[in-house]
């Protein structure tokens, strides 16, 4: 994350500062010390002084402790919401120092993912510094042991969040925590900064629930809820009281919602909205007024609806148009732009991890928040391919009437999938995406020739998958035809195109209950019914389709091969040295690059300045408008690689991988393979109620001629797809074509197959 905006330094007089510091530090110690030792009285199941969730996974513990009388227990099973649970606390960073240390004792039992301490510093933007012990992989069953994480204290940091988390399933206990700055307990530090507070810090009316209950909806209510969803979003980004941060806009939604839900007709609901807007105060005439500059405009905000007097009434229409016409500046409380990049940074979008479902207010808030963020800040709104207004109305009853966390998460997934943005997934709740289950058949599956095909057997659990063979076409799972299951699951997979959707579905499709699974396969010309064991499967990333083994190798004296899944920018000179004298270089991006090497490598593939991308970005003064903002090019560097360059891509090539392929294509590389995932551009993350994590593509990425890449993906110059026969024979048909492009058609297929054999 980019780092900016210094916290305000306290400039009060010495006597005042000393008195404030003593009182504040005493209060901080009184609150924090018993919470860290878990000796504070619990609040229901939750340890005293802490928040966390999802509900039903965090417990105050008295039987298993490290010291004293209490500890915290995090307990997750296959039905727990989200992909992780966390107990959380926060304090203002009103002190100075060099290093924050968060340490304590942890104990685990059957943790499938990992457990750990975590801490995060936030400023104007989140994540200035972060650690969650993921790299230590604390999993399985362990006795009490001491752990520590350290963060450099950023000057911009305003708030510290910290706690304990568990990813996957299992149990973890925490106790006897300490929070230190440069070795001292935090409450012993002098107060050197005045913590900035916002209306969100002061308004706590709905911290424990919106109080809004909805058990059914009629057509009038749905229309009215769609209207307030759009009005609430418009005011969030255009009304000066909201953009200045004077209103807790989430909670203001809960204050108006009851009158909208209870309105007998559209006119009554519209009248309530008029009174709501009037209560915010008069709109001052703008001076100067913001203008929508048509220069370099790609598309403007979709605001025709505020002129629809028949639909929203003349009074409401007049007020909304007045607010729009008197917009004055680019000041935004809920969003800023990343300097030098231009993607939105979403601020003050709270995750409300503590809410208990069902809660119609918070569920509506989740829908409205995502819908409006996409409406006003997605550079690809114009190619969504859906009637985005209809999506809002369609999902109001589906999201609001969900009664369990799983149903709530799946309905949000289905709504988000309508955005057709591969970055816009419900990333923290993928365990709720069908098929659901804690176990999986230990094989890799890929969609080949319009069928799910086994492409690899997991060697560590090969006995469980013994009946299956590489090249088997899966035709059924537990008695249900695979083609029907895939169609049933498709709506929940948020991707930019079908290639990426089938990539994700085949990645998940063997999940389910642990134990035996019935699998129908087609092997050669035979239809087989097999019994295969599903086994516990920790969270894992998508499978790369590059070659196993070393990052760089010579396939022959004439062909060099470099895969980007393990590439290191510092090693580029070594790769180029070792490739010297070859006729061609294969760059395999059928993966996600381990490091950003667009310039470190790409600049050695050109001998003149070569443009390869153009970008679009949003407009803080005109939310919903997007402009061309910059272009990018490769500057030539020595040594120049003079040979032919072939880039390999497929459906696993996403985001940074696609951007890298664009750059190398600009350097006149030949792209071989199949369509990529079509999700490009720096991402802009934010939270949804329930502690759910999502994001959108934050900037538009285009070729120099303004041809889009989003949804379309990187189209190969030479299209080659793997075949079932090739998979069974252990061939890499995409790599074979790359070698053929380098060596020419005179080289026999047998020789090429020998060079590329996996």
Please name every model-derived segment.
Residues 19-198:
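Extracellular and organelle-lumenal recognition/adhesion modules and their flexible linkers in secreted
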Residues 209, 227-347:
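Cationic-aromatic interfacial patches
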Residues 217-221, 225-234, 303-339, 355-376, ...:
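PDZ/PDZ-like domain segments forming the peptide/carboxylate-binding groove
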């Amino acid at each position: 994350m980019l780092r900016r905006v210094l916290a305000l330094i306290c400039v009060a007089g010495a006597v005042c500062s000393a008195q404030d510091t003593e009182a504040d530090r005493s209060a901080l110690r009184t609150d924090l010390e018993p919470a860290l030792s878990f000796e504070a009285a619990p609040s229901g199941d939750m340890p005293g002084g802490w928040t966390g969730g999802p509900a039903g996974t965090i417990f105050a513990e008295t039987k298993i402790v490290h010291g004293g009388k209490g500890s915290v227990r995090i307990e997750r099973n296959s039905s727990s919401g989200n992909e992780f649970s966390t107990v959380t606390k926060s304090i203002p960073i009103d002190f100075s120092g060099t290093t924050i240390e968060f340490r304590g004792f942890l104990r685990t039992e059957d943790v499938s993912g990992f457990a750990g301490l975590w801490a995060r510093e936030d400023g104007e933007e989140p994540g200035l510094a972060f650690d969650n012990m993921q790299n230590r992989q604390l999993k399985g069953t362990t006795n009490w042991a001491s752990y520590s994480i350290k963060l450099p204290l950023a000057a911009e940091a305003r708030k510290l969040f910290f706690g304990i988390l568990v990813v996957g399933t299992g149990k973890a206990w925490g106790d006897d925590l300490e929070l230190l700055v440069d070795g001292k307990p935090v409450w012993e530090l002098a107060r050197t900064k005045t913590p900035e507070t916002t209306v969100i810090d002061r308004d706590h009316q709905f911290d424990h629930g919106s109080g809004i209950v909805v058990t059914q909806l009629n057509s009038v209510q749905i229309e009215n809820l769609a209207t307030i969803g759009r009005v609430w979003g418009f005011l969030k980004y255009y009304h000066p009281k909201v953009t200045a941060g004077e209103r807790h806009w989430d909670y203001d939604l809960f204050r108006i919602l009851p009158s909208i839900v209870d309105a007998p007709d559209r006119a009554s609901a519209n009248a309530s909205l008029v009174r709501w807007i009037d209560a915010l105060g008069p709109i001052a005439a703008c001076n100067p007024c913001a203008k929508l500059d048509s220069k370099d405009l790609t598309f403007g905000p979709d605001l025709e609806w505020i002129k629809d007097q028949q639909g929203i009434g003349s009074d409401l229409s007049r007020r909304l148009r007045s607010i729009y016409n008197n917009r004055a500046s680019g000041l935004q409380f809920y969003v800023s732009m990343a300097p030098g990049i231009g993607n939105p940074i979403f601020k003050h979008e709270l995750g409300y991890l503590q809410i208990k479902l069902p809660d119609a207010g918070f569920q509506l808030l989740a829908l409205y928040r995502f819908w409006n963020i996409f409406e006003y800040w997605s550079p690809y709104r114009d190619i969504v391919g859906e009637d985005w207004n209809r999506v809002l109305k369609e999902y109001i009853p589906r999201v609001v009437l969900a009664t369990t966390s799983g149903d709530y998460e799946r309905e949000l997934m289905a709504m988000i999938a309508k955005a057709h943005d591969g970055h816009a997934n419900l990333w923290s709740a993928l365990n709720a995406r069908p098929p659901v289950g804690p176990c999986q058949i230990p094989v890799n599956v890929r969609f080949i020739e319009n069928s799910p095909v086994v492409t690899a057997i997991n060697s560590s659990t090969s006995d469980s998958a013994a009946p299956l063979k590489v090249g088997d076409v899966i035709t059924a799972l537990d008695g249900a035809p695979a083609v029907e299951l895939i169609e049933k699951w498709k709506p929940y997979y948020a991707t930019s195109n079908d290639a990426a959707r089938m990539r994700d579905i085949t990645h998940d499709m063997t999940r389910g209950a642990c134990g035996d699974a019935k699998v129908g396969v087609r092997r050669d010309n035979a239809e087989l019914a097999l019994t295969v064991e599903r086994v516990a499967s920790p969270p894992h990333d998508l499978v790369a389709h590059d070659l196993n083994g070393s990052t760089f190798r010579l396939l022959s004296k004439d062909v060099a091969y470099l895969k980007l899944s393990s590439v290191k920018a510092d090693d580029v000179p070594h790769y180029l040295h070792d490739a010297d004298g070859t006729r061609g270089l294969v760059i395999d991006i059928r993966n996600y690059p381990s490091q950003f090497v667009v310039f470190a490598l790409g600049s050695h593939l050109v001998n003149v300045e070569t443009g390869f991308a153009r970008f679009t970005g949003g407009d803080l003064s005109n939310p919903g408008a997007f402009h061309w903002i910059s272009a990018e090019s490769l500057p030539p560097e020595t040594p120049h690689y003079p040979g032919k360059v072939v880039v390999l891509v497929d459906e696993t090539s996403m985001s940074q991988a696609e951007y890298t392929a664009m750059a190398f294509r600009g350097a006149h590389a030949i792209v071989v393979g199949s369509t990529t995932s079509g999700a490009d551009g720096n991402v802009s993350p934010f939270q949804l109620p329930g502690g759910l994590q999502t994001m959108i593509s934050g900037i538009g990425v285009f070729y120099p001629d303004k041809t889009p890449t989003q949804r379309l993906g990187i189209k190969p110059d030479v299209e080659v797809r793997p075949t079932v026969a090739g998979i069974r024979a252990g061939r890499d048909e995409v790599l074979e074509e790359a070698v053929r492009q380098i060596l020419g058609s005179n080289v026999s297929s047998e020789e090429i197959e020998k060079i590329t054999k996996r």
